[in-house]
C-alpha cells in the first residue's frame, strides 16, 4: 500500500491526509479481530485460520484494484478538459489575445459535461475497504504461524524455520518494491490507450502509474498461497514417542474439558476469576512505571519511522524531482537490505555482549540519537522551492512573492485571457516554470512534433535575454545540479540511518518482556502492539498527511470545480515541516530513555540482569524485586 500512496492520491484526486486514512485502514481492520484471534486462535484449527487470512488478504487486494476497471480512463488534464488521447498542441492553452477561451463555460455546462464522467471520484472508499479487509486477513498469519511452527517443529529446528520465514518475508518486501518500481513506470491505463499519445512522463506531478496492477498480482498470489493451508493437519505427524505423549495429554485435556462442562457453576466461577485476573494484570502493567515509559518512547520512536515509510516517496519526488519508480527501486535494493542486516546485527550484539536491561536501553538510546542526528542533517539537504511564475515569483519572473495566493497577472500575459486554475506546466529557457503556455505568454508552438516547444513567449522575454528565442518546452524545469547532489547525500544518509536504527530497534523486542513479570509477558506484548497500531499505524499517516497538505501551493481542480490532489508543494516548507515534526517526536524519546536508564539503575540494587540462558533466574529475580519494591501487585495463578 505504501508503495502506491502517491499514485492513489493522484488517481482519485484526494489529499495526503485522506491517503493517510486509507493507509491506516489496514491497522483498523487488524484491530477489529486481534482480540478474537488472540483468544480463540490457539483453540481452533490454526492452519485453516491462516488459510482464511491469506484468502481475505487476497480478496482485499483485488477489491482495492477494482475501481480501476470502473472509473474510465485517467484524464491528467482535467483542469483544461483536454482528452489525454489527443497529443496535439492545438488543445494546449496558448495565449489568445482578444479572444475568449473555449474553457470559459458556465458552471452548469461544466457540471453537465464533467461531473457525470467523474462519478467514480468516491471510489477510493473501495480501496479503503479493501485495505481494511487485508488488515483483517493479516491478523492470524504471523502469531498463529509462528506458534504453529514453534509447537510442532522438531527440537532445535524451530529457530531455523522461523529464520527462514523472516528471510522470505524480507525477500518478499524487496520483490514488492521491485514490482512497485516497474508498475510505477507503466501508465495507469496501459493496454487501453495508445501510449504514444501520452505527453506526460513519470517525473510529471500528474503521472499515475499502474498502481492497480500490484494489488491485482498480490491478490492472486495470496489466494493461491492460501490453498495449501487448508490441507495441513491440526497436529502434524510426530515421532512415535511424542505421538503417544501427545495422545495421553489429549485424553487428559478431553477429560478436563468434560469435567468443566459437567460443572457449569464452577465454569462460571472460572470465567469470572479469569476476567477479574485479566483486569488486575492489565492494571499491574499500566501502573508499572518502566512499562509505561517504554510504551511512550517506543510509540514516539516508531511514529517517526511510520511517517518516513509512508511519505518518503512523496518527499523525494518533491524535494529532488525523482520519479516514484526510481525511489521504489533504490529503497528495495539498498534501504530494505540495510534494515535486514541491521536487525541481524542487533540480535548478534545483544547475544554477543549479553546486554543487561541498562545495556539494552543504551542500545536503544544510540539508535534514537542516530535517528535524531539524521533528521537534523536532512535540514541541510532541503532544496529551495522551484522557481514557478505565479506561485513563488511574479508572472514576469522578476520578483519573488510572499504568498502564492492571488498573484496578479503581469502585463506580459494580462491580455491572453488565461485560466489561472490550469496546470499544464512549461519550462522557459530562462529556467522558470510557468503554470501553462498561456500564462507564459506563448503564442505559437511546434505542433505535434516531439518535444513540444512553444515560441514567442512574452513572459519569458521579459527576463531581458538578448538575441534569444523566447521559448518554453512542455513540462516542469528540472532541479539544478546542487539539488541533485543533495539527493545522493540524502539517500546515503537514509541507508545508514536505516541500518543503524534497525540495530537499536531490536532491543525493544527484548525490553518489553524483561520489564514485566513472566506471567504478564503475553499481555504486555499484546497491549504494546495495540498501542503501536492504533496511535501509530492509524494516526501517524493522517496527521503527517495533514501537515504535508498545508505546504501545497497548487491544487488541481476537477471538472466539478472541487479541489483534487496537490500538483506542487513548497519544498522548503515541506522539508522543514516534515523533518521538524520528526525531530519533535524523537527528542522526547532521548529524554524518556534517560529516565528509563536512571530508574533501572536505581531499582536494580546492583543485580546482574544480563540476558544469559544460565542466568535467566537471576535476571528474573532482579526484575521481580524491582516490581515488588515498586508495589506492583500481580495476581498469582491461584488467585486468578
Swiss-Prot record:
Residues 406-461 form the Kazal-like domain. It is found in: Cell membrane. GO terms for cellular component: basolateral plasma membrane. It is a multi-pass membrane protein. Disulfide bonds join 412-442, 418-438, 427-459. The chain crosses the membrane at residues 17-37, 50-70, 124-144, 160-180, 212-232, 293-313, 330-350, 363-383, 493-513, 522-542, 578-598. Residues 38-49, 145-159, 233-292, 351-362, 514-521, 599-640 are cytoplasmic. GO terms for biological process: bile acid and bile salt transport; sodium-independent organic anion transport. NCBIfam families: oat. This is Putative solute carrier organic anion transporter family member 1B7. It comes from Homo sapiens. The gene is SLCO1B7.
Amino acid at each position: 500500500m505504501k508503495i502506491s500512496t502517491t499514485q492513489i492520491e493522484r488517481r482519485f484526486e484526494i489529499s495526503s491526509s485522506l491517503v493517510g486514512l486509507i493507509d491506516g485502514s489496514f491497522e483498523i481492520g487488524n484491530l477489529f479481530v486481534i482480540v478474537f484471534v488472540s483468544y480463540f486462535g490457539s483453540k481452533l484449527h490454526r492452519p485453516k485460520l491462516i488459510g482464511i487470512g491469506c484468502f481475505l488478504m487476497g480478496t482485499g487486494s483485488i477489491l482495492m484494484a477494482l475501481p480501476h476497471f470502473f472509473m474510465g480512463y485517467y484524464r491528467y488534464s482535467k483542469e483544461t478538459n483536454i482528452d489525454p488521447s489527443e497529443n496535439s498542441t492545438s488543445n494546449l492553452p496558448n495565449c489568445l489575445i482578444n479572444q475568449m477561451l473555449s474553457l470559459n463555460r458556465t458552471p452548469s455546462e461544466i457540471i453537465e459535461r464533467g461531473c457525470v464522467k467523474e462519478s467514480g471520484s468516491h471510489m477510493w472508499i473501495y480501496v479503503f475497504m479493501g485495505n481494511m479487509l487485508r488488515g483483517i486477513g493479516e491478523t492470524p498469519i504471523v502469531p498463529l504461524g509462528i506458534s504453529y511452527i514453534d509447537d510442532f517443529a522438531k527440537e532445535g529446528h524451530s529457530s531455523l524455520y522461523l529464520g527462514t520465514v523472516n528471510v522470505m518475508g524480507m525477500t518478499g518486501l524487496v520483490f514488492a518494491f521491485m514490482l512497485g518500481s516497474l508498475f510505477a513506470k507503466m501508465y495507469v491505463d496501459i493496454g487501453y490507450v495508445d501510449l504514444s499519445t501520452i505527453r506526460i512522463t513519470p517525473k510529471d506531478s500528474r503521472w499515475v502509474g499502474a498502481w492497480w496492477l500490484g494489488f491485482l498480482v498480490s491478490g492472486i498470489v495470496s489466494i493461491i498461497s492460501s490453498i495449501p493451508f487448508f490441507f495441513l493437519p491440526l497436529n502434524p505427524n510426530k515421532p512415535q514417542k511424542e505421538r503417544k505423549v501427545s495422545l495421553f495429554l489429549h485424553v487428559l485435556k478431553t477429560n478436563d474439558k468434560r469435567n468443566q462442562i459437567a460443572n457449569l457453576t464452577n465454569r462460571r466461577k472460572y470465567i469470572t476469576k479469569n476476567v477479574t485476573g485479566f483486569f488486575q494484570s492489565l492494571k499491574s502493567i499500566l501502573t508499572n512505571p518502566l512499562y509505561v515509559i517504554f510504551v511512550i518512547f517506543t510509540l514516539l520512536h516508531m511514529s517517526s519511522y511510520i511517517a518516513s515509510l509512508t511519505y518518503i516517496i512523496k518527499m523525494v519526488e518533491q524535494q529532488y524531482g525523482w520519479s516514484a519508480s526510481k525511489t521504489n527501486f533504490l529503497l528495495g535494493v539498498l534501504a530494505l537490505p540495510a534494515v535486514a542486516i541491521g536487525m541481524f546485527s542487533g540480535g548478534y550484539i545483544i547475544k554477543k555482549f549479553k546486554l543487561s536491561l541498562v545495556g539494552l536501553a543504551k542500545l536503544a538510546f544510540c539508535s534514537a540519537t542516530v535517528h535524531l542526528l539524521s533528521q537534523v542533517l536532512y535540514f541541510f539537504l532541503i532544496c529551495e522551492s522551484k522557481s514557478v511564475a505565479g506561485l513563488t515569483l511574479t508572472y514576469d519572473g522578476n520578483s519573488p512573492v510572499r504568498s502564492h495566493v492571488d498573484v496578479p497577472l503581469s502585463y506580459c500575459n494580462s491580455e491572453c485571457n488565461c485560466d489561472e486554475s490550469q496546470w499544464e506546466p512549461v519550462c522557459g529557457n530562462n529556467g522558470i516554470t510557468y503554470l501553462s503556455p498561456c500564462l507564459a505568454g506563448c503564442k505559437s508552438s511546434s505542433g505535434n512534433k516531439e518535444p513540444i516547444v512553444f515560441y514567442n513567449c512574452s513572459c519569458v522575454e521579459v527576463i531581458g535575454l538578448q538575441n534569444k528565442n523566447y521559448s518554453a518546452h512542455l513540462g516542469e524545469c528540472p532541479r539544478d545540479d546542487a539539488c541533485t547532489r543533495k539527493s545522493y547525500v540524502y539517500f546515503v544518509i537514509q541507508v545508514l540511518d536505516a541500518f543503524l536504527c534497525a540495530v537499536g530497534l531490536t532491543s525493544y523486542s527484548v525490553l518489553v518482556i524483561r520489564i514485566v513479570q513472566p506471567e504478564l509477558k503475553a499481555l504486555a506484548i499484546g497491549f504494546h502492539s495495540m498501542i503501536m497500531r492504533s496511535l501509530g499505524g492509524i494516526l501517524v499517516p493522517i496527521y503527517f498527511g495533514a501537515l504535508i497538505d498545508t505546504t501545497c501551493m497548487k491544487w488541481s481542480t476537477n471538472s466539478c470545480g472541487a479541489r483534487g490532489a496537490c500538483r506542487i508543494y513548497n519544498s522548503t516548507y515541506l522539508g522543514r515541516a516534515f523533518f521538524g515534526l520528526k525531530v519533535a517526536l524523537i527528542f522526547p524519546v532521548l529524554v524518556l530513555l534517560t529516565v528509563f536508564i536512571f530508574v533501572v539503575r536505581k531499582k536494580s540494587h546492583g543485580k546482574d540482569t544480563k540476558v544469559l540462558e544460565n542466568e535467566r533466574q537471576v535476571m528474573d529475580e532482579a526484575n521481580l524485586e524491582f516490581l515488588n519494591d515498586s508495589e506492583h501487585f500481580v495476581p498469582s495463578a491461584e488467585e486468578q
